[in-house]
Design a protein with these regions (language model features):
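Pyridoxal 5′-phosphate
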Residues: 1-165
Length: 165
């Protein structure tokens, strides 16, 4: 650790910011618990860049029924989240990405529990720490993203699991 402290952080990239305040920020490399990140700056997303062309080809191959299924999945999930008494949905309208929190439950623990059920979500403040935590005063959030890869059964499973809250 003492050796790592001798080096300046020269590159900053994705995943390197621990916290953001109105007039300051904390880099992971400056946090004694995350000192190793000084040597792991965020990298250009080369894999994603290369895959973009293939993704566009795939997107162009989709049928209208695929688009209809996605729209139905989004509306079904939105209606469920909006009407659940313990869920606070941030979205004002249906969208492929929806953010929410559950009153009285830690979002990170709920995210882990959903993962155990085969449901992948993101938790936290999604790179807008200061705005969400300090200005909006939200607890850490859960974010669900739906896409063409999600089946109607996926959404039904998610709703079944969240219904137990």
């Amino acid at each position: 650790k003492s050796f790592a402290k001798l080096f300046d952080t020269t590159f900053i990239g994705g995943g390197m910011v621990d916290d953001v305040k109105k007039s300051s920020y904390l880099l992971s490399a400056d946090n004694p618990d995350h000192l190793h990140t000084k040597f792991e700056p965020g990298l250009q997303a080369w894999g994603e860049i290369i895959a973009l062309g293939h993704s566009l080809d795939w997107l162009n191959s989709l049928e209208k029924s695929d688009h209809d299924r996605l729209e139905n999945n989004i509306n079904t999930l939105y209606d469920f989240l909006k009407n659940h008494p313990k869920i606070h949905l941030l979205n004002q309208s249906p969208a492929s990405t929806m953010s929410f929190y559950v009153e009285g439950l830690d979002s990170h623990l709920l995210g882990e529990s959903l993962s155990d059920q085969g449901i992948m979500v993101r938790t936290g403040y999604f790179c807008v720490h200061y705005y969400l935590s300090e200005i909006k005063k939200y607890p850490p959030l859960l974010r669900i993203s739906l896409g063409f890869h999600n089946s109607t059964a996926d959404v039904a499973h998610l709703i079944k699991v969240l219904s137990k809250i």
